[in-house]
Amino acid sequence: MNSSFHLHFLDLGLNTTDGNLSGLSVQNASSLCEDMGIAVEVFLALGLISLLENILVIGAIVRNRNLHTPMYFFVGSLAVADMLVSLSNSWETITIYLLTNKHLVMADASVRHLDNVFDSMICISVVASMCSLLAIAVDRYVTIFCALRYQRIMTGRRSGAIIGGIWAFCASCGTVFIVYYESTYVVICLIAMFLTMLLLMASLYTHMFLLARTHIRRIATLPGHSSVRQRTGVKGAITLAMLLGVFIVCWAPFFLHLILMISCPHNLYCSCFMSHFNMYLILIMCNSVIDPLIYAFRSQEMRKTFKEIVCFQSFRTPCRFPSRY
């Protein structure tokens, strides 16, 4: 186990035999790069905040029928992925704390298996996040460029099948990760998926925003509801751009860590970067905290439902808000 309260995502055979999962290359560079120790309370606080926020998001989607649309179903899938990464990091933090302070005793083999479970949960979470973001992007694309056929294309049953397929694929990825945890190819595949997702999203967004203005002018003569749907689609695309930007900023250091761990594990500069792994985990958890804030900032309907849920739970009575909400 890592003495600074967190496991490395995959030690790839670099861990010591006494159960310490810190890479040898990181230890060799300790004189040059000091590992940034982060208090266990920070991980637990972020995990709790993220968990409560994302439960609120899912509750809002379930409660408000106006949010029963494909886009918000995909947002709900993204919220579940954020919850999963928060739960895994919090659970891992508690386990390491108990082991470090001798409140919990486990055999080395059990520690290794538990480490694989934590890593698998992170793997499932990142794959689910990428797939959910991609699904939202496709939904926004259809909303903007196929506005008149949107209801026929993106039905509730079809969006449910997409979400089911996403999580079945994620579960398969998590299973493969546990079975082949010693193989570097698993990490390479995860990195390739991340880069492929970025390429697909960049291509989709470039095409979407280049044509959006022209397409909006072209349908200006159509009935007002089509124009409203189109403007809503553009607003949703901007929201997705914000979600994607935060995702990249928060997850990129983690994936760079994986790339360096494979390509130059014994290089001192690479080891220096990898020695701050705990900070990259903090960034991942910050992503789970920021996403619900973006939903609330960008969606009046979501914001209104958040207030209703919080007020009802606090006072056990429905709240009434001004019509501007």
Swiss-Prot record:
Domain of life where this protein originates: Eukaryota
Extracellular membrane side: 1-37, 98-114, 180-186, 266-273
Regions of this protein lying in the Cytoplasmic compartment: 62-73, 139-155, 212-239, 298-325
Lipid-binding residues (covalent, S-palmitoyl cysteine): C311
GO MF: melanocortin receptor activity
Cellular component, GO annotation: cytoplasm; plasma membrane
Pfam families: 7tm_1
Membrane disposition: Multi-pass membrane protein
Cell location: Cell membrane
UniProt function note: Receptor for MSH (alpha, beta and gamma) and ACTH. The activity of this receptor is mediated by G proteins which activate adenylate cyclase. This receptor is a possible mediator of the immunomodulation properties of melanocortins.
Name recorded for this polypeptide: Melanocortin receptor 5
Organism: Bos taurus
Lineage, opening ranks: Eukaryota, Metazoa, Chordata, Craniata, Vertebrata
